[in-house]
Amino acid sequence: METDYNPVELSSMSGFEEGSELNGFEGADMKDMQLEAEAVVNDVLFAVNHMFVSKSMPCADDVAYINVETKERNRYCLELTEAGLRVVGYAFDQVEDHLQTPYHETVYSLLDTLSPAYREAFGNALLQRLEALKRDGQS
C-alpha cells in the first residue's frame, strides 16, 4: 500500500474545524458512512471540478458512494467503507463489479494517484497557507 499523507491544516479552506478532517478510518466505530462521505467531499472540493455524495446509490452505516470529476475531467464513482476509499466505476453512480482497485486510507492518497492536477492544486493550497502563516508571524 502506498504512503498516505495528511495536509497541513488545510481545514480553513475546507470549512472544517481543526482536528475534524479524516486521517484514516481506523477507530471510526461503524459511523454513518454518509456523514463520513460528506466530510471527505468538503475536505477536497477545492481541488476537483465536481464531487458529491451519490443520491442514487445505496448508502448504509457501512458504505457510501462518492462521485468525483477531476480537473482533468475524468469521472469516477468511489466507494467509502471502513477499509477506506476505492474506485468502483468510471462514471457517476456506476459500480463495475469486475474492478479490483486498491483501497486508499485517505482521499488525499486516492486523488494523488488519479489526478496530477489535484497534486498541483493541493500544493498551491498548501503554499498559500504557509505564506499566510508566514505573514501572520511577521505582523
Swiss-Prot record:
Family membership = Belongs to the GSKIP family.
Positions of the UniProt region annotated as Interaction with GSK3B and acts as a GSK3B inhibitor: 115-139
Q: Under what name is this protein listed?
A: GSK3B-interacting protein
> Could you state what the record's PTM comment says about this protein?
Phosphorylated by GSK3B.
Keywords (A to Z) from UniProt: Cytoplasm, Nucleus
Under the heading Pfam families, the entry gives: GSKIP_dom (PF05303)
Q: How does it assemble?
A: Forms a complex composed of PRKAR2A or PRKAR2B, GSK3B and GSKIP through GSKIP interaction; facilitates PKA-induced phosphorylation of GSK3B leading to GSK3B inactivation; recruits DNM1L through GSK3B for PKA-mediated phosphorylation of DNM1L; promotes beta-catenin degradation through GSK3B-induced phosphorylation of beta-catenin; stabilizes beta-catenin and enhances Wnt-induced signaling through PKA-induced phosphorylation of beta-catenin. Interacts with GSK3B; induces GSK3B-mediated phosphorylation of GSKIP and inhibits GSK3B kinase activity.
Instruction: Site Required for GSK3B interaction: list residues.
Output: 130
Any idea what a deletion of this gene does? Knockout Gskip mice die at birth. At 18.5 dpc, embryos are still alive but rapidly die within 5 to 30 minutes after casarean section. Embryos obtained at 18.5 dpc are cyanotic, suffer from respiratory distress, and fail to initiate breathing properly.
Q: Which GO cellular component term is one of those annotated? A: cytoplasm
SUPFAM superfamilies noted in UniProt: Hypothetical protein c14orf129, hspc210 (SSF103107)
The record's listing under InterPro entries reads: GSKIP, GSKIP_dom, GSKIP_dom_sf
> What's this chain's function?
A-kinase anchoring protein for GSK3B and PKA that regulates or facilitates their kinase activity towards their targets. The ternary complex enhances Wnt-induced signaling by facilitating the GSK3B- and PKA-induced phosphorylation of beta-catenin leading to beta-catenin degradation and stabilization respectively. Upon cAMP activation, the ternary complex contributes to neuroprotection against oxidative stress-induced apoptosis by facilitating the PKA-induced phosphorylation of DML1 and PKA-induced inactivation of GSK3B.
* Localization, UniProt: Cytoplasm; Nucleus
Looking up PANTHER family in the UniProt record yields: GSK3B-INTERACTING PROTEIN
Q: Which GO terms describe its molecular function?
A: protein kinase A regulatory subunit binding; protein kinase binding; protein kinase inhibitor activity
A single BP term in Gene Ontology: negative regulation of protein kinase activity
Q: Which gene encodes it?
A: Gskip
Residue ranges the record marks as coiled coil: none
Region labeled Required for PRKAR2A interaction — which residues?
41-45
Species of provenance: Mus musculus
